[in-house]
Amino acid sequence: MIIFFEIWHWSWALLGCYLNLLLAYLAIFKSPKAIKSYATLIINYAATDFVECALDSFLQTRLLAVPGEAELVYIFNGPCKYIGSISCKVGLSFFLHCLTHSVWSLLLSFGYRFYILHNPSLSRLVLLKLILVFYIPSLIQALTYWTIFASREEILPLARQWFPYYDLDAETGVLTGIIDLTNFVAIYSIGHICLPFFPVYITIFILRQKIINQLHVKQHVMSPDTKAAHSQLLKALTIQAFIPIFVGIAVTFYFLSQSGLVRSPILEYSIYAVAILAPALSPITYLYFVRPYRQNVKRFIANPFKILLNTNTGSSIGVFHSGGRPSNFATTLNTSR
């Protein structure tokens, strides 16, 4: 079983690293002038998801939640086990902070999409400040969560009692855990990981409906290309909103394990195995729907070296895929009120 999940983690993590690195490159060097400010949000996504994918391959985590109790046991089977337990603990803290920051970033993207229906687009500096504000809760989580992990010597005797049906002494990975989930750091971190997810998604879909309603109201003053561009961006954001549902599935798996309703090593491995799908698949939405990015991807596939040598943005017009016809992104970001 461990071999299957090891292959799973490596495959999705490497794919995610490649796609997010490609997206970051395109957002930095190939974004038309008209979407330079919005590209700040795209770069934020790509950087966050790249780090998340890289850390997933580094950690390859198995989570054993003690049924009905306030304790957790982690087993790290990735390369971090060859460096030391502290690297696994810090790595997990930063992996989880990437996961939460991705969710907040998605909310920011939908909020910004709604904002520019009524206002001019914001500068890159203002967007960067907003990203930093949304990042603060996740940063606090990253800097504190790893400090509450117990050592192998502390957790192993307890883990034997909690999971007598496992031979945990034979585990070759780094064994650690949290003995008390009721302390403030644990409550903050676990709460920040699990609780905002569903309220944020409800808010996102409310914003999505408001955006659709506003587009219907304003459609008589929009050009066909502008309406098509808004429609395609909304589709991209909607698809991107569904991709992190994998995180929701992982959270559900965790609650099933913590409640004791389901006990299975497959479930324990699957919590983090499912979560990696979100950052690995997320960049595809931008790589496909943002027309300049999609065109550069096609050119890259045809000639992988030429695009790396040419970092000029080229055009000042950005368009979204719209049923085969171009849509001006400049008008998308500056819709008339």
From Swiss-Prot:
Keywords: Membrane, Transmembrane, Transmembrane helix. InterPro entries: 7TM_GPCR_serpentine_rcpt_Srd, Nematode_rcpt-like_delta. GO terms for cellular component: membrane. The chain crosses the membrane at residues 2-22, 90-110, 130-150, 187-207, 236-256, 270-290. It comes from the Eukaryota. Gene3D superfamilies: Rhodopsin 7-helix transmembrane proteins. Belongs to the nematode receptor-like protein srd family. PANTHER family: SERPENTINE RECEPTOR, CLASS D (DELTA)-RELATED, SERPENTINE RECEPTOR, CLASS D DELTA. This is Serpentine receptor class delta-18. It comes from Caenorhabditis elegans. The gene is srd-18.
